Amino acid sequence: MTISPPEREKKVRVVVDNDPVPTSFERWAKPGHFDRTLARGPQTTTWIWNLHALAHDFDTHTDSSLEDVSRKIFSAHFGHLAVIFVWLSGMYFHGAKFSNYSAWLADPTRVKPSAQVVWPIVGQGILNGDVGGGFHGIQITSGLFQLWRASGITNEFQLYVTAIGGLVMAGLMLFAGWFHYHKRAPKLEWFQNVESMMNHHLAGLLGLGSLGWAGHQIHVSLPINKLLDAGVAAKDIPLPHEFILNPTLMSELYPKVEWGVMKGVIPFFTLNWGAYSDFLTFKGGLNPVTGGLWLSDTAHHHLAIAVLFIIAGHMYRTNWGIGHSMKEILEAHKGPFTGEGHKGLYETLTTSWHAQLAINLAMMGSLSIIVAHHMYSMPPYPYLATDYPTQLSLFTHHMWIGGFLIVGGAAHGAIYMVRDYDPVVNQNNLLDRVIRHRDAIISHLNWVCIFLGFHSFGLYIHNDTMRAFGRPQDMFSDTAIQLQPVFAQWVQNLHTLAPGGTAPNALEPVSYAFGGGVVAVGGKVAMMPIALGTADFLVHHIHAFTIHVTVLILLKGVLFARSSRLIPDKANLGFRFPCDGPGRGGTCQVSGWDHVFLGLFWMYNSLSIVIFHFSWKMQSDVWGTVAPDGTVTHITGGNFAQSALTINGWLRDFLWAQAAQVIGSYGSALSAYGLLFLGAHFVWAFSLMFLFSGRGYWQELIESIVWAHNKLKVAPSIQPRALSIIQGRAVGVAHYLLGGIATTWAFFLARIIAVG
């Protein structure tokens, strides 16, 4: 940290342009108004594709100064938030008007959540299954009921009011998006003032946001959940505002602290924090009534997070000559072997939003995958852990979202390299040095992929062969040649024992996934130790293989986006181009865009195996029923350890055996999943028509169809064109992923709703 002389400091100001862009509905009504070429209108059918491809590519618009692009992004953020608020409002509205929330709240272990009732127009009423409590509807797996209970929502009217609040917020966001682009648009220096931005985001969004949530948890969620856990009916519990306005209600539940506007904070400032130990706890483990984390633990967590981030929001130097400067930190950050280190990165990240976005997407994607793993190992909401369909859905959802964001990070990294990279700024710094030894990086990564691929598949094929020959004693398994994941087992053991030393007052381990007892709620397993064996060791190395291949493709795309041995001037061809002519041993599918295209398939590959592993492992070794004497019966009876050792086992005992429910769903409330399963297979197959396509064949076909139209004098004025190679690939990968994801969705849900 440095303290600078006042004359060196440039004062931070909020500077805006007034009325920079007129609000013109007439202009917006003209398709392609943002681009001179597109605004002329269509000559050929390619125009409509370009319209969609470029509408959000602000760099290509007619006015594309850095300032204007920054303003458009800023404004679009508000539009995005408006869409999110409308979407959330719809969720809450369904909860208010079409759900069995109150019935679920009264009996969450037997009643299933439902917030959608289908109108029986031509017999669709069959989809409204009996979810318990006398309610018929579609079982939902979003986890919203559990979240609402954790928030302290006790009736449908509260959901209705919140839904209206969501629409009000959406309106405010739309207004803000318009206002900050058309009326008062910030100047470029405001967008580039990173210290103020960090301070506001850290202290404001994360710090005060967490503090607000902690306050809500303490004053509303905790008392309401304490009463619900004790068996008090929701209708007999005081309303949220009563707990806030009436201190005696809180004193009855949490007598240690004196409740009142001023009295309540005295223990905080006199360091008598023990007074808060009724509701700011450090118990560890799960609440045995609900199978979720102790809400008093999560309130404590959010309060601690708030304190950390509010302090963090005072770290950076703005108008007071004290604190860190981002540029100074980056330029001082160099090691003995890294040349100029991080020099130049400040300029890069303040002038290239693609570079900034690439980092943010990679980080948020990784975070989403971390969230996926915490949702089952440390289920945050009441009765979430025993709602197996919701657990499976939340894991799958957060894995896929994470995968898409990480691929997006590579996409924008490559766009940065092509459009924004400045060789003058990046001289012998980390970025330059990585690019200069990219051949070593990529060839090593390639070797790792080959090694992992052959060895991990080799182990499976060995097992398939030995099982076919009737030689189980020669297989890699827990009962023959063991390949135990000893490091993973050591880490599990370490995490089970460590809190005894690091958090001696905690009552239970951090997560029962690592070790400890079985937590059962309503006769179902909420969480229990997840034992790892040879089958997990094998599939783990398949995960390692597929993830490394995904990284290889994406990283190669970024590092070779500007140039390669075959195409030294690749940067001039742009982010996406189909080929660079014949000869030279092949120049097709080498653009930055093509690497993203190929990376998406491997991302899908990787995550399919991850969610299959999770689904089968949990059904086999975790999820199931608990008898009064404590005996656990798992859904598939622990068959993972022996069946998942061979490729045939995965095909027969997972895919085929567990598809029985979706294939046999016709005539039941799950029949929609049967139709989706079929339809999504069709969408997936349709994608192959675009991926294995010959563009010339289609263009020829189109020409002969146009000839026929000309003969009949009904030819269109806009010339039809076959899809370009890039367009075909884009349509192909979109349908491939949509078909694959919807197929998996139908397969998973039909199965787990039937047996879970």
From Swiss-Prot:
Keywords: 4Fe-4S, Chlorophyll, Chromophore, Electron transport, Iron, Iron-sulfur, Magnesium, Membrane, Metal-binding, Oxidoreductase, Photosynthesis, Photosystem I, Thylakoid, Transmembrane, Transmembrane helix, Transport. GO terms for molecular function: 4 iron, 4 sulfur cluster binding; chlorophyll binding; electron transfer activity; magnesium ion binding; oxidoreductase activity. It catalyses: reduced [plastocyanin] + hnu + oxidized [2Fe-2S]-[ferredoxin] = oxidized [plastocyanin] + reduced [2Fe-2S]-[ferredoxin]. It is a multi-pass membrane protein. InterPro entries: PSI_PsaA (IPR006243), PSI_PsaA/B (IPR001280), PSI_PsaA/B_CS (IPR020586), PSI_PsaA/B_sf (IPR036408). Phylloquinone binds at W698. [4Fe-4S] cluster binds at C579, C588. Chlorophyll a' binds at H681. Its EC number is 1.97.1.12. Chlorophyll a binds at M689, Y697. It is found in: Cellular thylakoid membrane. SUPFAM superfamilies: Photosystem I subunits PsaA/PsaB. GO terms for biological process: photosynthesis. The chain crosses the membrane at residues 73-96, 159-182, 198-222, 298-316, 353-376, 392-418, 440-462, 537-555, 595-616, 670-692, 730-750. GO terms for cellular component: photosystem I; plasma membrane-derived thylakoid membrane. PSI electron transfer chain: 5 chlorophyll a, 1 chlorophyll a', 2 phylloquinones and 3 4Fe-4S clusters. PSI core antenna: 90 chlorophyll a, 22 carotenoids, 3 phospholipids and 1 galactolipid. P700 is a chlorophyll a/chlorophyll a' dimer, A0 is one or more chlorophyll a, A1 is one or both phylloquinones and FX is a shared 4Fe-4S iron-sulfur center. It comes from the Bacteria. The keyword Cell division does not apply. Its main location: membrane. Belongs to the PsaA/PsaB family. The PsaA/B heterodimer binds the P700 chlorophyll special pair and subsequent electron acceptors. PSI consists of a core antenna complex that captures photons, and an electron transfer chain that converts photonic excitation into a charge separation. The cyanobacterial PSI reaction center is composed of one copy each of PsaA,B,C,D,E,F,I,J,K,L,M and X, and forms trimeric complexes. PsaA and PsaB bind P700, the primary electron donor of photosystem I (PSI), as well as the electron acceptors A0, A1 and FX. PSI is a plastocyanin/cytochrome c6-ferredoxin oxidoreductase, converting photonic excitation into a charge separation, which transfers an electron from the donor P700 chlorophyll pair to the spectroscopically characterized acceptors A0, A1, FX, FA and FB in turn. Oxidized P700 is reduced on the lumenal side of the thylakoid membrane by plastocyanin or cytochrome c6. This is Photosystem I P700 chlorophyll a apoprotein A1. It comes from Cyanothece sp. (strain PCC 7425 / ATCC 29141). The gene is psaA.
